[in-house]
Protein backbone atom coordinates (compact mmCIF):
# COMPACT_ATOMS: atom_id res chain seq x y z
CA UNK A 1 0.00 0.00 0.00
CA UNK A 2 1.30 3.43 -0.88
CA UNK A 3 0.01 6.98 -0.98
CA UNK A 4 0.95 10.14 -2.82
CA UNK A 5 0.95 13.13 -0.48
CA UNK A 6 1.55 16.84 -0.90
CA UNK A 7 3.62 18.52 1.77
CA UNK A 8 5.36 21.87 1.54
CA UNK A 9 4.57 22.32 -2.15
CA UNK A 10 6.20 19.02 -3.10
CA UNK A 11 4.67 15.61 -3.80
CA UNK A 12 6.00 12.40 -2.24
CA UNK A 13 5.18 8.73 -2.83
CA UNK A 14 5.18 7.12 0.62
CA UNK A 15 4.40 3.80 2.24
CA UNK A 16 4.39 2.76 5.90
CA UNK A 17 7.85 2.77 7.45
CA UNK A 18 9.38 5.19 4.93
CA UNK A 19 11.67 7.95 6.18
CA UNK A 20 11.70 11.20 4.23
CA UNK A 21 12.87 14.79 4.51
CA UNK A 22 10.13 17.41 4.33
CA UNK A 23 10.33 21.18 4.72
CA UNK A 24 10.82 22.48 8.26
CA UNK A 25 7.61 22.15 10.29
CA UNK A 26 8.63 23.42 13.72
CA UNK A 27 7.68 20.15 15.43
CA UNK A 28 9.99 18.66 18.07
CA UNK A 29 11.38 15.14 17.93
CA UNK A 30 8.89 12.28 18.57
CA UNK A 31 5.85 14.50 17.91
CA UNK A 32 3.08 13.24 15.64
CA UNK A 33 2.41 14.97 12.33
CA UNK A 34 -0.87 14.46 10.44
CA UNK A 35 -0.89 15.07 6.69
CA UNK A 36 -4.39 15.44 5.24
CA UNK A 37 -3.41 16.55 1.74
CA UNK A 38 -3.51 13.08 0.14
CA UNK A 39 -3.65 13.01 -3.67
CA UNK A 40 -3.89 9.24 -4.29
CA UNK A 41 -3.95 5.91 -2.46
CA UNK A 42 -3.17 2.49 -3.91
CA UNK A 43 -4.38 -0.50 -1.92
CA UNK A 44 -4.80 -3.00 -4.73
CA UNK A 45 -6.63 -0.41 -6.83
CA UNK A 46 -5.74 3.24 -7.36
CA UNK A 47 -8.09 5.81 -5.79
CA UNK A 48 -7.88 9.53 -6.55
CA UNK A 49 -10.05 12.63 -6.24
CA UNK A 50 -13.14 12.43 -4.04
CA UNK A 51 -12.36 8.84 -3.01
CA UNK A 52 -9.43 10.07 -0.91
CA UNK A 53 -11.10 13.22 0.45
CA UNK A 54 -11.10 11.90 4.03
CA UNK A 55 -7.79 10.03 3.84
CA UNK A 56 -4.84 10.99 6.01
CA UNK A 57 -1.25 9.97 6.59
CA UNK A 58 0.29 9.98 10.06
CA UNK A 59 4.01 10.47 10.61
CA UNK A 60 6.30 10.84 13.60
CA UNK A 61 9.19 13.30 13.66
CA UNK A 62 12.52 11.49 13.84
CA UNK A 63 14.73 14.60 13.98
CA UNK A 64 13.65 18.23 14.10
CA UNK A 65 15.13 20.74 11.70
CA UNK A 66 16.78 23.11 14.17
CA UNK A 67 20.49 23.45 13.64
CA UNK A 68 21.39 19.87 12.82
CA UNK A 69 19.19 19.00 9.85
CA UNK A 70 20.26 21.39 7.17
CA UNK A 71 20.66 20.50 3.54
CA UNK A 72 23.84 20.94 1.57
CA UNK A 73 24.56 24.57 0.71
CA UNK A 74 23.36 25.81 -2.65
CA UNK A 75 25.44 28.62 -4.16
CA UNK A 76 23.65 31.28 -6.21
CA UNK A 77 26.03 33.26 -8.40
CA UNK A 78 24.93 36.07 -10.70
CA UNK A 79 27.31 37.92 -13.00
CA UNK A 80 26.45 40.76 -15.29
CA UNK A 81 28.86 40.85 -18.18
CA UNK A 82 30.81 44.00 -18.93
CA UNK A 83 29.38 45.74 -15.85
CA UNK A 84 31.93 44.66 -13.21
CA UNK A 85 28.95 43.49 -11.17
CA UNK A 86 28.58 40.11 -9.52
CA UNK A 87 26.65 38.64 -6.63
CA UNK A 88 27.32 35.45 -4.68
CA UNK A 89 24.85 34.13 -2.12
CA UNK A 90 24.47 30.84 -0.29
CA UNK A 91 21.35 29.09 0.96
CA UNK A 92 20.87 26.08 3.24
CA UNK A 93 17.40 24.59 3.52
CA UNK A 94 16.23 23.44 6.96
CA UNK A 95 14.22 20.24 6.92
CA UNK A 96 12.42 17.83 9.23
CA UNK A 97 13.03 14.09 8.98
CA UNK A 98 9.82 12.05 9.48
CA UNK A 99 8.85 8.37 9.51
CA UNK A 100 5.47 7.39 8.03
CA UNK A 101 3.59 5.32 10.61
CA UNK A 102 0.05 4.94 9.26
CA UNK A 103 -1.90 5.44 6.04
CA UNK A 104 -5.64 5.66 6.66
CA UNK A 105 -8.09 5.66 3.76
From Swiss-Prot:
Keyword annotations of the record: Ribonucleoprotein, Ribosomal protein, RNA-binding, rRNA-binding
Source species: Aliarcobacter butzleri (strain RM4018)
Gene Ontology cellular-component terms listed: cytoplasm; ribonucleoprotein complex; ribosome
Keyword check for RNA-binding: yes
SUPFAM superfamilies hit by this protein: L21p-like (SSF141091)
GO biological process: translation
Keyword set includes Ribonucleoprotein: yes
Phylogenetic placement of the source organism: Bacteria, Pseudomonadati, Campylobacterota, Epsilonproteobacteria, Campylobacterales
InterPro entries assigned: bL21-like (IPR028909), bL21-like_sf (IPR036164), Ribosomal_bL21 (IPR001787), Ribosomal_bL21_CS (IPR018258)
This protein's name: Large ribosomal subunit protein bL21
Pfam families: Ribosomal_L21p
